[in-house]
Amino acid sequence: MKLIFERSRPGRGNGLLPSLDVPAAPLPEKYRRKTAPRLPELGESDLSRHYQALARRAFGVCDGFYPLGSCTMKYNPKLGEEAAALPGFTGLHPLQPAHTVQGAQAVLNRTEHLLCEITGMDAVTLQPAAGAHGEFLGLLLIKAYHHSRGDTGRTVILVPDSAHGTNPASAAMAGFTVKNIPSTPEGLVDLEALRAACGPDTAGLMLTNPQHRGALRERHPGAHRPRPRRRGPRLLRRGQPQRHHGGGPAGRHGLRRVPPQPPQDLRHPPRPAAARAAVRWGASRFWPPSCPVPPCVATAESTPSARCGPSTPTSWWSSRPWAYLLRLGNTGVAEAAHTAVLNANYLKRKLEEAGYTAAFPGLCMHEFVLTLEELKKETGVSALDVAKAMLDAGIHPPTMYFPLIVHEALMFEPTETESPETLDEAAAVLAEILRRAKEEPEALHAAPASTPVGRPDETAAARRPVVRYAFPED
């Protein structure tokens, strides 16, 4: 299909600006562009068709089953969209006086209170805008904590070898050196290796729990002191906090930092590709002095004070999880967590019965990992081939080749919003793909056959990305 710039024609715009309702003020010369921006110019019908064509090439939760592991691609209740669309949120300006945004600040304050209740933390900040952003914030807080004590020699962050690639990247960006901690054959952090890695230069540990293999470490490293007499916070990357509800808040596990992701795990907004949604950070009581400002605190009259500071997009994002949590209540949130775990174990068992091999045996939490290593050796069919074949059946592929400690990995996360019938249909599709892999492997090498886009050159896209349109006159 044509790019939007290729459809553009000079003067064919459809913008209608409202009449000016404030005194006109000239823009200072230093802020003016020297040349006009090269924006696409299309009629509204062409513009609408262009984006409809793009939508047909995409796959969303409303199009079908979306078991993308570690991303929690659950269905979004429309109630959250109504809450986020209220003028009191969408019409806010960052520089409005605090007394004019008391309603939005009340939502922020109440959202923080609910998240503290869920996580067991003493304080929450709503500042981060994305998952890796949240990691980065946590690492900066770790650095600020050590520096506040005059301890500037702690420059090493411990990261499990099964961690998200964003973990070491965030640590490096925050100025730390990364030291990898190996996993046990069960896919859990090797505590002996962790003890050996700890030293006077250790700043902290980044840990995902449940871990990406789908297992819950019931006792966190540090709860049984793998780092005796050594100071170092634990940064728990709790990607799916609702999976823990009813199982004990993080604050009771000795954790000091935890980033729940309400818009993602409790209620996430639509997002392109697999981009993370906004992350909220929780901290135990000795962290708040280092937390980002402005905090949203309540006065004795139970109304948010002016300390909330300028309004930010946080209020718009926070209205979604706030509405979601209020709608579910304590019982509903716990039921959602239990259903997510039940769905993952149900689908895992169905796929094992169909002939697939789980990377790690036993019960899982919210997600699980298959290994297709033996299938590839026997038939030449890879995890990529199976994932592409799922697209022909109207199912979005799971996460591929992650975690890195599992060869030919497929990570499934069915989420709690999927029905048993959907899981049965997905299991049947994957059973048929397995049969085809053994009987007609060449057909799977060519999958998908029915989608608008087949197999793009992902290596070239990663190494030579084209992120800017090449205008003919350039």
Tell where the protein language model's regions lie, with residue ranges.
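Non-catalytic terminal extensions of PLP-dependent enzymes
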Residues: 1-123, 308, 325-474
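Conserved phosphate/anionic-ligand binding catalytic regions in large, soluble enzymes, centered on
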Residues: 59-79, 127-135, 263-280, 313-317, ...
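Glycine- and other small-residue-rich loops at beta-strand/loop junctions that grip anionic moieties
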Residues: 69, 127, 160, 208-212, ...
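Conserved PLP-enzyme active-site core in the AAT-like
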Residues: 103-106, 133-303, 342, 355, ...
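A short, small-residue-rich loop immediately preceding and capping a beta-strand
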Residues: 122-128, 156-159
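Short strand-loop junctions, especially beta-strand C-caps/beta-turns
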Residues: 129, 184, 208-210, 371-375, ...
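Mobile "lid/hinge" segments at catalytic clefts and subdomain interfaces of large enzymes
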Residues: 275-348
